[in-house]
Amino acid sequence: MTKNYSFEGEGGNATLQDLFGNKQTLVIYSYMFGPQREKPCPMCTSFMGTWEAKLPDVEQRIAFVFVARSPIARLIEAKKARGWTRHKVYSDPSGDYTRDYVSAADADAPGYNVFTRRDGTIRHFWSGETGRATADPGQDPRGAPDLDPLWAVLDTTPEGRGKDWYPSLSY
């Protein structure tokens, strides 16, 4: 890793190294909530909601954070609106991390990246792919593997995901 990316979190500034905490593996889910968006992406928000109950289990073994391009105050506001207490949210204000690991064009796109830290060296281990090439006709792109139980369940039904249905941002 040649750059030490800088993020803004609820507790202040943090580097990529800081995001690991005391773990050797870090997962960063980049969600679609760029500065041009009024609200976060409903699909990303739904996916993130599935982690609220599981983060304590996951974080026994790895560090898991959520990154978006909007200012940290907006990320915190959206987190509170959903009632999330366990999500560690960070802003990528410069866009450096997003351009290097999610979208070279700095597009408002989701991303799932795994990093390792061994002997003080950070390496990129794995990325999930959810680009347009993974979309079925009339559908949004799907990740492989699809980590969201909402889609895993709907994909087993005759109705499927639906062409125009999105999860709600409030219930």
Summary of predicted features, one role per range:
Residues 9, 55-74, 85-96:
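Thiol-based oxidoreductase modules, predominantly thioredoxin-like and allied folds used
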Residues 1-46, 52-56, 60, 80-81, ...:
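Non-globular targeting/processing and membrane-anchoring segments
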Residues 77:
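Short active-site loop/helix that positions an aromatic residue
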